[in-house]
Amino acid sequence: DYVLEPDGAVIRARLIGDLARRHGARMMDSTIAYMTAPAPVDSPLLQCFQVLEQVPYSLKNVTALIGAAQVGTLEIKKRGIDIDPAQLRGTLPLKGSGSATLILTRVQGKKTAILAQRLP
């Protein structure tokens, strides 16, 4: 699966639903501006991330997820979860040669952590 992050202009224009339909994507949560699709989407209006793993959000789950993936360089994105990414980064075992994106959000109302790879 893939997570799609719309450009800020799309969000401000409230065209997320239209963009989702155009690309065969669906909203991850009715109140969050992230979409999901079964295949990668190439659009200048979207940033696409390939999902590597998804777990319920907790510090314990995120720490285990990052440690197992041997991630040394981590981009943290968040929507709908009240957390300070810089503070979270300081608690994670960032050891390894891999790089990834951690997306913290709500999926159908549930706090979720998604480890993903940003696509070009």
What does each model-found stretch correspond to?
Residues 1-120:
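SAM-dependent transferase fold signal centered on methyltransferase-like domains
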